[in-house]
Amino acid sequence: MNQSAEAPSSENVATRQIRIFDTTLRDGEQSPGASMNLAEKLEVASALVDLGVDIIEAGFPIASPGDFESVRQIATTIRGATICGLARCAEKDIDRAWEALKTAPQARIHVFLATSAIHREFKLRMTPDEIVERAVAGVRRAASHCDDVEFSPEDACRTEHDFLCRVVEAAIDAGATTINVPDTVGYTTPGEIYDRFKMLRDRVPNMDKAVLSTHCHDDLGMAVANSLAAVDAGAGQIECTINGIGERAGNAALEELVMAMKTRQDFYHCQTNINSKRLVPVSRLVSKTTGINVQRNKAIVGRNAFAHESGIHQDGMLKERTTYEIMSPEEVGFTKTDLVLGKHSGRAALADRAKQLGMTLTGEQLQEVFEAFKELADKKKEIYDGDIVALVQQKISETVAPEWTLVDYEVTSGKNQTPNVRVTLRRDEQDITEQVAQGDGPIDAAFWAVEKITGIQVVCKDFRVRSATLGRDAIGEVNLEVEHEGKTYRGTGVSTDSVESTILAMLNAINRIVAGIASDPGELPQP
């Protein structure tokens, strides 16, 4: 492994192209609470194409009817990337995956089968010979449908070297064009994975007929480091997710991998097709869609990633930016100027700013966002980028025509007074209903009032409030998860008033209940 303290010379070293395989819609969605509905998956898939990913793993078609339909719709409508579906090494899985993928101009079937001794003995109860036989049959079945077949020996990083080489060689002979080596439980280390990839390249005689891929989990916090070590050892594809979301502790973060290879091209001698200026907008979209906030100190896309508080650092930055910044905020999609618009700004200025922030609006969306923007401008002197992002994503998240809309609300509360909230709602642009409710606080009272009007009872499973911008007049964004009749629904609301944000988020979730748009990923196995 190249562990030199000094960067190696880039002279006479060819730059390799690394494929980016994004599994946000499959492995990322397995992160607890991160499930997405069809419209949200299509929006994320479109954003991934704009970002420049090479392969989009759209889902696991046999897992549920909803997952099948998501993969089918993405395969039918999304262009500009290979669309991939996951399948176990079983005919029914593989045929179901192909049924969902067959309309895609570029389709890939990704089959997997566990190979480690612990999985063979306790999960599959199969002998090594039976594993090889099933792997070969699965790859052949997939290859009968399409030319692009990926095989993953699940838990490869805990599989004996000799047996791993045997399975990989057999899979390539059967038609696998990509061999993915998963660190399924996030157990390996950079040195170990480097040696494993080098071993496969040296010992598997037909390895040159397939692309080696890495898929690392972050249980020990080494997913990105392990993925980069695999690239250093010859991997030509990295499997990753936006913001590193995924099963348990998550997956390797796409944004960190891409910027590590870009910033240290002198070391890795690799490049990708990723447009790095789209990283922050796509990160925000996935965060908004899944309801999983990005931690402030997250590398590359966190709010503090380019913040400098130390006086020594600030002094150095003023004298020469590169003293404390190894890449520029603009390079990953942050904007130089945060303060942008005011109450006298027009539609064109709003549309232009939204585009600069990575969000293209349709005419109808622009009109809705502009109306919300003007309302906000009457409440706030200065409109920040974060305000615009919150407004746009709020409107985009409204994937169905709302049955219930907010007309008015009024809060009465005090130190020695039980909070009362009066809420007035309109249904289908016609009937107006008003209710007053009490609660442990204004937000609890607002929940009760909305439930009384709509007649829909829910259990709040998660409730989060965050400030979209700085200042005492900042927009508050509420993201909540509610349960109704055994299904989970998400809602989002933004306003300068936390009670109004809560009511809007509640209505967003209730309108999804009425429309039957649940957030339910089903059972999703993983490689």
Swiss-Prot record:
> Which residues are listed for Mn(2+) binding in this entry?
D27, H215, H217, N251
Q: Which family does it belong to?
A: Belongs to the alpha-IPM synthase/homocitrate synthase family. LeuA type 1 subfamily.
Catalytic reaction equation(s): 3-methyl-2-oxobutanoate + acetyl-CoA + H2O = (2S)-2-isopropylmalate + CoA + H(+)
Q: What residue intervals traverse the membrane?
A: none
Q: SMART domains, alphabetically? A: LeuA_dimer
EC class: transferase
The GO cellular component terms are: cytoplasm
**Enzyme Commission (EC) number:** 2.3.3.13
One MF term in the entry's GO annotations = 2-isopropylmalate synthase activity
In what residue span(s) does the Pyruvate carboxyltransferase domain sit? 18-280
Q: In which pathway does it act?
A: Amino-acid biosynthesis; L-leucine biosynthesis; L-leucine from 3-methyl-2-oxobutanoate: step 1/4
Q: Where is this region: Regulatory domain?
A: 405-527
Read off the lineage from the record: Bacteria, Pseudomonadati, Planctomycetota, Planctomycetia, Pirellulales
The record's subunit annotation is: Homodimer.
Q: Which UniProt keywords apply?
A: Amino-acid biosynthesis, Branched-chain amino acid biosynthesis, Cytoplasm, Leucine biosynthesis, Manganese, Metal-binding, Transferase
What is this protein's name? 2-isopropylmalate synthase
Q: What InterPro entries does this protein map onto?
A: 2-IPM_HCS-like, 2-isopropylmalate_synth_dimer, AIPM/Hcit_synth_CS, Aldolase_TIM, LeuA/HCS_post-cat, LeuA_allosteric_dom_sf, LeuA_bact_synth, PYR_CT
Functionally, this protein is described as follows:
Catalyzes the condensation of the acetyl group of acetyl-CoA with 3-methyl-2-oxobutanoate (2-ketoisovalerate) to form 3-carboxy-3-hydroxy-4-methylpentanoate (2-isopropylmalate).
Q: What is its main location?
A: cytoplasm
- Database matches in PROSITE patterns: AIPM_HOMOCIT_SYNTH_1, AIPM_HOMOCIT_SYNTH_2, PYR_CT
Give the GO biological process terms. Answer: L-leucine biosynthetic process
Q: Which prosthetic group or cofactor does it need?
A: Mn(2+)
Where does this protein reside within or beyond the cell?
Cytoplasm
